[in-house]
UniProtKB/Swiss-Prot annotation, chain B:
Gene: RAD18
Zinc finger (RING-type): 28-67
Region (Disordered): 107-132, 302-344
Organism: Yarrowia lipolytica (strain CLIB 122 / E 150) (Yeast)
Membership in a protein family: Belongs to the RAD18 family.
Keyword DNA repair among record annotations: yes
Its EC number(s): 2.3.2.27
A UniProt-annotated Pfam family: zf-C3HC4_2
Protein name: Postreplication repair E3 ubiquitin-protein ligase RAD18
Pathway(s) of this molecule: Protein modification; protein ubiquitination
Length: 169, 344
């Protein structure tokens, strides 16, 4: 912890990590990329069953701000993802990751926003359910939103392609 | 490294796994530590004084748990929880050790002592009696109860509250000292007022910072934020049962400046292309560019020469190797690298 006393953010993330490994949610693994810097985590998310993402294993990073948990982390998939709520660069757009006050899409109620009582496992579970149920009201990837609404078959085809790519097939 | 961070999951594998919930309940949802100076919101949720004040000043004016509107002035001390935390955290390590040791040995079954109805009755009667005496005692000694001053939020005995208010919350006078001087010599810490950025002048904030012995350097924004954080840290300290010294709080403020503020400032300044007239820029830095180009050329040349030398050596080596072995795979690899170097 760079020799100094760990900050509030670091301390809280240590606890979250410890709790996470003692009781990990199904289909999710996560942890700090480097035990000296708890502000950057790497995670792996399993594609939920009965969705086009089934069978996939998607790597992502979670970047925490210095004032965590007052502000939320930023989550970014590091593999190619085709999903209405994921920007083309992999950044996840989901209400639990938006601080109350900033609302990029003007549709979220304050109750589903980030609050310090949320935690890493809740974020990752929300992302998993977002994979299962895209929200086409807030299009982060407009093409994917349209495709999901208008041509489900083609959407599934493209997603299956990214799943195979993520698995290196 | 994880074993030295106590957290609710410590109880999971023990015989008393139910204590995980107790442990969790006694922790602040924001920092996940046991409550320090717990404060209860108007909507009934409890947080550390520092955590909730920081959140309400910097992030949002809503309760983090239920999102109801919330203001710092609505916060009240949660004394029962504070005491609970104190007792539980003092016993925690012991309970955990005992429970974990017990997990290794089979626990003998607990036998309920037989209870006779007579005994029960007697107990109940004595219990009622005790309650009654307690009640009267409370009535008699109501002046000894600590009450919070509605103006400055200092805690003082009920008997002293009227005089305290008459003196405009100033108890440092010769007469006011008698209820203080008996036990502690330190005067009670007082909360300080927040400043409103819209109505307060910079000079005023600078003076306030100076009065507290804090740094007065930085922009207007920095000064206001520094004072704001100071108020948060200080007032949270006042809520503490055993307040820390002023220099400790100053250390906290310094740490906050070095982690949070320094990090914000470290974000790269966005340079827009509009700001730069590229022709002017090239002219101004022509010498630098020329120098860099020259350096780059030189280093490329040097690398090429080195690689050529290496290749020659390798070729010779390979020739020998190929002579010895029939496997010609390394030969192919070599031609690949050769091709790459021609391109560069």
């Amino acid at each position: 912890m760079s020799g100094k006393r760990p900050s509030v953010a670091q301390k809280r993330l240590m606890k979250e990590y410890k709790q996470f490994i003692s009781d990990p949610p199904q289909g999710i693994s996560a942890g700090p990329a480097d035990e000296d810097n708890f502000l950057l985590w790497e995670c792996l998310i399993q594609g939920p069953d009965d969705t086009p993402y089934e069978g996939g294993l998607f790597p992502a990073t979670l970047k925490f701000p210095q004032d965590y948990p007052l502000s939320p982390p930023v989550m970014k998939f590091t593999c190619e993802m085709y999903h209405p709520n994921i920007y083309k660069d992999g950044t996840v757009c989901i209400s639990i990751l938006h601080a109350p006050g900033d609302d990029p899409n003007m549709y979220e109620s304050a109750s589903e926003r980030w609050s310090p009582i949320q935690s890493v496992d809740k974020i990752l579970l929300s992302v998993m359910s977002m994979l299962a149920e895209p929200n086409d009201e807030s299009g982060a990837n407009i093409d994917a939103s349209k495709m999901w609404r208008d041509d489900q078959e083609q959407f599934v085809k493209i997603v299956r392609g990214t799943v195979r790519k993520a698995l290196g097939l | 490294m994880n074993s030295d961070i106590p957290d609710p999951s410590d109880w999971i594998d023990s015989k008393l796994s139910g204590l995980k919930d107790v442990d969790e309940t006694l922790r602040c949802h924001i920092c996940k530590e046991f409550f320090t100076a717990p404060m209860i919101t108007g909507c009934g949720h409890t947080f550390c004084s520092l955590c909730i004040q920081r959140y309400l000043t910097n992030t949002s004016q809503r309760c983090p748990t239920c999102m109801q509107e919330q203001q710092i002035s609505q916060l009240r001390k949660n004394v029962t929880v504070e005491t609970l935390v104190e007792h539980f955290s003092a016993q925690r390590a012991t309970i955990l050790r005992v429970v974990k040791e017990a997990a290794k040995q089979p626990i003998p079954e607990v036998v309920e002592p037989p209870s006779s109805p007579d005994l029960d009755d007697g107990r109940r009667r004595s219990g009622r009696k005790r309650t009654r005496t307690n009640y009267t005692e409370t009535l008699v000694s109501s002046d000894d109860i600590q009450v919070e001053c509605p103006v400055c939020q200092a805690m003082l005995p009920g008997a002293a509250i009227n005089r305290h208010l008459d003196n405009n919350c100033n108890d440092t006078g010769a007469n006011g000292g008698n209820w203080l001087g008996t036990k502690k010599k330190t005067k009670p810490l007082r909360k300080i007022q927040r400043v409103n950025q819209a109505s307060e002048s910079v000079a005023n904030v600078r003076r306030k910072l100076q009065d507290e012995g804090l740094s007065t350097s930085g922009s207007k924004q920095t000064l206001f934020r520094r004072y704001d954080e100071w108020v948060t840290l200080w007032n949270a300290n006042v809520d503490n049962k055993t307040p820390r010294s002023k220099s400790d709080i100053k250390d906290d403020l310094r740490r906050w400046e070095t982690t949070v503020v320094a990090n914000e400032n470290a974000q790269p300044v966005k340079m827009t292309i509009k700001n730069i007239d590229d022709r002017q820029w090239v002219q101004k830095h022509k010498e630098d560019y020329d120098y860099l180009i020259e350096q780059a050329r030189k280093s490329i040349l040097k690398k090429k020469q080195e690689k050529e030398k290496e290749q020659q050596q390798q070729q010779e080596g390979h020739q020998k190797a190929v002579d010895r072995r029939e496997d010609n795979e390394p030969d192919m690899k070599r031609s690949e690298t050769e091709g790459y170097q021609v391109v560069s």
